[in-house]
């Protein structure tokens, strides 16, 4: 019997290019940032990650997941958005997604923007230099292997 291996990636990145963000602000700016970073799918109505990220960006001090949940619910209510995906378990899942991209860090039970750095620094140092470089190196290994295997 043939064994079928699982095609589970060790790491995955999705980037999207949109129009320049000149006039965007508040939630719409964070939404486009989430779309650009692959945290949100185009047309996805389950967009609580936008609110979670915005709450963390606006927080002046590290905050707990319970406080994130409370602020997300309040923000969605103020904007007339449905209270979909605001359960504590989903808020923690979204925080984990933000942590996996090195945008948010958890210290004890509190969350903040990673190292209190700017998003530009985090993108450059963590995503481009670390995450993207390691993915690109592995893709190059597959390309080299394919070139050797399928000689022309």
What positions do the PLM features span?
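Short, amphipathic alpha-helical interaction segments positioned at domain boundaries
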Residues: 118-148
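Short acidic, hydrophobic short linear motifs in intrinsically disordered regions
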Residues: 62-82
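Short amphipathic alpha-helical interaction segments
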Residues: 81-100
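Eukaryotic partner-binding/assembly regions in large regulatory complexes
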Residues: 1-17, 126, 130-134
């Amino acid at each position: 019997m043939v064994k079928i291996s699982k095609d589970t990636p060790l790491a995955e990145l999705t980037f999207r290019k949109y129009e320049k963000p000149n006039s965007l602000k508040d939630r719409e700016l964070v939404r486009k940032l989430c779309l650009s970073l692959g945290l949100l799918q185009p047309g996805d109505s389950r967009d609580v990650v936008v609110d979670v990220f915005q709450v963390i960006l606006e927080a002046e001090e590290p905050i707990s997941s319970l406080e994130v949940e409370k602020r997300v619910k309040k923000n969605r209510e103020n904007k007339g958005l449905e209270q979909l995906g605001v359960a504590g378990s989903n808020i923690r899942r979204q925080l984990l997604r933000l942590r996996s991209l090195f945008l948010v860090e958890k210290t004890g039970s509190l969350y903040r923007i990673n190292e209190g750095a700017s998003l530009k620094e985090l993108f450059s140092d963590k995503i481009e230099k670390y995450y993207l470089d390691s993915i690109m190196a592995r893709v190059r290994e597959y390309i080299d292997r394919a070139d050797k295997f399928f000689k022309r």
